[in-house]
A protein has these predicted regions:
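N-terminal lobe of the biotin/lipoate ligase/transferase fold
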Residues: 1-83, 89-90, 105-107
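Long, positively charged amphipathic alpha-helical accessory segments at protein N-termini or as interdomain linkers
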Residues: 58-91, 101-178
Length: 178
């Protein structure tokens, strides 16, 4: 489906729900994708990762440690999803939320992460982890250096497969104490 924003969809859903298990929101396209400081993130229908994962807060989490762990998990998942295309220095996270890949003579933005906290009264109850990755985009209109995985490494990874890999890894990694 098309949605304005998977994070907004998840946040709206959480107003009436309080899941005790992970819930994944994904779309073929979002029309009002957002990043830090209300910046827009553009995607092409069916060609990019557009997802938000809702997780109940775990006792061992703190907001700062969670953000760092999410970023490192996204980075390692991209490295694993594209074997042979990258080495350890090919993917980095520019704090707090930009995912960059090396191409040619520099780093280009390939995706972003937006972690939003949900509070019930004074209790931190859930997080919404929004992730966008340029997988097969051709129209990258951001005002900064952006690239897609397919343009950088002629990757044929499916956005749907990458969504599944990201969701599984995040659920596994964030469940473990860190």
């Amino acid at each position: 489906p098309d949605v304005p924003s998977t994070n907004q969809w998840a946040m709206d859903w959480l107003k009436s729900e309080a899941p005790h298990r992970p819930i994944l929101f994904t779309a073929d396209h979002q029309t009002e994708g957002k990043g830090q400081r209300e910046r827009q993130w553009h995607s092409e229908r069916g060609r990019d990762v557009v997802m938000s994962l809702v997780l109940p807060v775990q006792p061992h989490w703190t907001p700062a440690s969670l953000n760092k762990r999410v970023a490192l998990t996204v980075r390692s998942t991209l490295l694993e999803a594209l074997p042979g295309a990258m080495n350890e220095r090919s993917v980095l996270v520019k704090w707090p939320n930009d995912v960059l890949i090396w191409h040619g003579a520099g780093h280009y933005k390939v995706g972003g992460i937006l972690v939003e906290n949900v509070w019930r009264g004074s209790a931190w109850s859930h997080v919404v982890i929004g992730i966008g990755v340029n997988v097969q985009s051709r129209r990258l209109t951001q005002p900064y250096r952006a690239i897609s995985l397919s343009d950088a490494w002629q990757s044929s990874v499916s956005p749907h497969v990458l969504v599944e890999q990201l969701a599984i890894r995040l659920i596994q990694d964030l469940h473990q104490p860190f």
